[in-house]
A protein has these predicted regions:
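Low-complexity, acidic/polar, glycine-enriched regions of mature
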Residues: 1-176
Length: 176
């Protein structure tokens, strides 16, 4: 078995959020990049992923794209979103994932484990696609309220961030 360290130097970790509500045209669907994160991936002799451990710094989440809003996001909007995510949503607490089981499937693996964020640890399962060149990609849907996170809302609740967001991982494993 070999152990590989991955992080921003080998790929991306992003969070996709979506807006809803009668005033959703005033908000934006966001692509938020996690700038500081690291993961340890254990790979078996056959090249199959055996385990995954990931840690992310909640203060390093930065909005990279805002789609479908009535107007472009301003620098103040971006700063306010960053502050809200770090202080109100995640409480400045580290984000971590530790696999408990990895099961093979066509074109990849299903990873089961424990996701910790905002003071809460819960089971999480997602599929990872693995290409022949070592590219690893997966999306984990997360229902914020299951981690005791209250989705953002404004304008007396007429603009909200949808309760389910997506954590998207896309990395290149080395050919070792």
């Amino acid at each position: 078995m070999t152990t590989q360290q991955v992080g921003p130097q080998s790929g991306t970790l992003k969070v996709n959020t979506y807006r809803e509500g009668v005033a959703q045209k005033l908000g934006h669907d966001l692509v938020i990049e996690v700038e500081q994160w690291d993961a340890t991936v254990d790979v078996g002799p056959d090249g199959a992923i055996q385990s995954v451990q990931l840690n992310a710094d909640p203060s390093s989440l930065r909005v990279r794209e805002g789609h479908n809003g009535a107007k472009a996001l301003t620098d103040k909007d971006l700063k306010d979103i960053h502050t809200s995510i770090d202080e109100k949503v995640l409480g400045g607490k580290p984000i971590a994932f530790a696999s408990t089981a990895v099961e093979p499937r066509d074109d990849g693996v299903t990873v089961r484990g424990e996701l910790t964020m905002a003071h809460t640890t819960r089971p999480a399962t997602f599929d990872i696609d693995v290409s022949g060149d070592g590219r690893v990609a997966g999306t984990l849907p997360v229902t914020q309220s299951e981690w005791d996170i209250k989705p953002y809302k404004a304008f007396m609740g007429t603009l909200k961030v949808r309760d389910t967001v997506e954590i998207v991982l896309d990395v290149q494993l080395s050919a070792d």
